[in-house]
Regions:
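Non-transmembrane, aqueous-exposed alpha-helical and coiled segments at domain scale
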Residues: 1-312, 408
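Short, solvent-exposed amphipathic alpha-helical segments in soluble enzyme
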Residues: 162, 204-208, 275-279, 292-294, ...
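Feature captures the catalytic cores and cofactor-binding loops of soluble hydro-lyases/lyases
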Residues: 208, 212-252, 346-475
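C-terminal binding/interaction regions
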Residues: 252-260, 267-268, 281, 449-507
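Short, structured beta-strand/loop micro-motifs enriched in basic residues and often containing a Trp
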Residues: 314-324
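Residue "hotspots" at secondary-structure boundaries inside conserved domains
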Residues: 327-330, 367
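Short, well-ordered loop/turn sites that connect or cap secondary structure elements
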Residues: 329-332, 338
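Short, charged beta-turn/beta-strand-edge "cap" motif at the junction between a beta-strand
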Residues: 337, 343-347, 483
């Protein structure tokens, strides 16, 4: 009988979450590099370049791929012949491992988990509790999968209760464009079919734990070998989702998904539950077994697994944000690449809610935003000699409902985030001759290298959601919504969908 010791299990969980914070799965890197090689849209290729370069930097520096180091998810398959030498419950051991990983002094990870989600929403400080799925199976080992998934992609999860005769392909192709770019494509789609609603969602999440291997399936189809129903569906969805032209970061292009994963389960005769969960550019998961011989040893990938490319935005225009005016902003056009220099402020969900509440009460804000830019970010705490930890953008659409009031009552000139802006936000930007700039999701460590000074200037009690002042040098951004309200995310995907020519563009 296998005996799993408490400390071995806890340390294995801790090591796994540290490991995936800075190592992409090699299969993801290989798939992204293939997409990079064939990409024809310069803006999308630039975004993929940043993701690939950032990934290698993180592997070398052992720092997080993304500032959103995710909510910890653990899949366990525990053999029936396993005995535990432990005083803690399995859940408590998992959570202790997560706690150790996220508070590690050499690579502190961001605590993003909030207790009392419908009320006070208070940070638990150590990213616990984890979400745990445990299954008792035959055997004498413990199979463990650890995954860290950020809010940007989790928030785009979808569930539909289709009629038995409804087309899954039609539903997916109708749904993907409604998800925007907040899930940070190019990524992987996980689809669960059948069972009950909660089973379909679990299948979709579990499917994302497998390796990217769509190229093997393409080779199988080309050889004339017979495909299963799910294999044929994977290939059809892979081709047609990419034909939508959404592209990397929603900028338009040839590749939106690097793979499509599907798991299914028998379902009721009256039902066809279908769930879809995307994995973002910060795909993070690792699998291992414990057999009682001690804690797991995870073999680091070789740096040779990363492509030898560098990021140098030669076409970027340097901008002094300390002297920014509406007149200068008006000269920027959708798609322009800028290199920001000077002081910017940060602020995301909680800070915006508090600022708007203060404005509604007639109170003075603690920061003067006149002619300033605000960056939607919740950075990782610094370690060693860092000014700030990884500091990539968060999804901008969550701030849409605050945009008009912030622009009209604070003197704010522009915003920096990831993904698209909604119609109302674009109108507010146009009405106020402001601007929205996009930083690349999945390039948090690369962005952090452009931040030369950082200090909290307001709302320190909000933790990672506090307002910081950053002094930046050559921080790369793209004009996503210009002062006339033109949005690259609204225009570019349709252009590339038409260019690919598989799916007609609706007028």
């Amino acid at each position: 009988m296998t005996v799993i010791k408490q400390e071995d299990f806890i340390q294995s969980i801790a090591d796994a979450f540290q490991f995936i914070s800075y190592y992409h799965p090699v299969d993801y890197i290989q798939a992204l590099y293939k997409a990079w090689q064939k990409e024809e849209n310069p803006a999308a290729k630039d975004a993929m370049t940043q993701i690939l370069v950032n990934s290698r930097m993180c592997a070398e520096g052992h720092r997080p791929i993304c500032q959103d180091t995710g909510i910890a998810t653990v899949f366990l398959k525990v053999g029936m012949n396993v005995q535990w030498d432990a005083k803690m419950s399995v859940a408590d051991m998992v959570n202790e491992g997560v706690r150790r990983a996220y508070t590690h002094p050499d690579n502190t990870l961001r605590a993003s988990v909030l207790a009392d989600p419908a009320g006070k929403r208070q940070n638990t400080k150590d990213n616990t509790p984890a979400v745990i799925h445990m299954e008792i199976v035959a055997g004498d080992k413990v199979e463990v999968t650890c995954a860290a998934k950020g809010g940007g992609s989790e928030n785009k999860s979808k569930l539909a209760m289709l009629n038995p005769s409804d087309s899954i392909v039609d539903w997916v192709l109708k749904t993907i464009p409604t998800m925007g770019a907040g899930w940070c494509p190019p990524g992987i789609l996980g689809i669960g079919i059948g069972g009950t609603p909660e089973k379909a969602m679990l299948l979709a999440k579990e499917s994302l734990m497998s390796h990217a291997d769509i190229h093997e399936l393409q080779e199988k189809a080309a050889s004339g070998a017979e495909l299963s129903t799910t294999e044929a569906l994977r290939l059809e969805l892979f081709e047609k989702v990419n034909a939508l032209g959404i592209g990397a970061q929603g900028l338009g292009g040839l590749t939106t998904v690097l793979d499509v994963k599907i798991l299914d389960y028998p379902t009721h005769a009256a039902s066809k539950p279908v769930a879809m969960i995307p994995n973002c550019a910060a795909t993070r998961h690792v699998e291992f077994e414990l057999d009682g011989s001690g804690p797991v040893h995870l073999e680091p990938p070789s740096l040779e697994d990363w492509p030898d490319i560098t990021y140098n935005p030669e076409n970027g225009k340097r901008v002094n944000v300390d002297t920014l005016t509406k007149e200068e902003v008006a000269t920027w056009k959708m798609g322009d690449v800028l290199l920001l220099n000077g002081k910017i402020y940060t602020g995301r969900d909680a800070a915006h809610k508090r600022m708007v509440d203060m404005l509604n009460k007639g109170e003075k804000l603690p920061v003067d935003f006149t002619n300033k830019l605000i960056y939607y970010v919740g950075p990782v705490d610094p370690v060693r000699d860092e000014v700030v930890g990884p500091a990539g953008p968060t999804t901008a659409t969550r701030m849409d409902k605050f945009t008009r009031q912030m622009l009209e009552h604070t003197g704010l000139l522009g915003m920096i985030g990831k993904s698209e802006r909604g119609e109302e936000a674009c109108k507010a930007i146009a009405d106020n001759k402001a601007v929205y700039l996009m930083a690349v999701g999945g390039s948090a460590y690369l962005v952090a290298k452009a931040i030369k000074k950082a200090k909290v200037v307001a709302f320190e009690d909000l933790g990672m959601e506090a307002i910081y002042e950053f002094e930046v040098k050559d921080m790369p951004v793209t004009v996503a919504v210009d002062s006339s309200g033109q949005s690259v995310h609204a225009i570019a995907p349709k252009k590339w969908q038409a260019k690919i020519g598989i799916i007609p563009v609706e007028s």
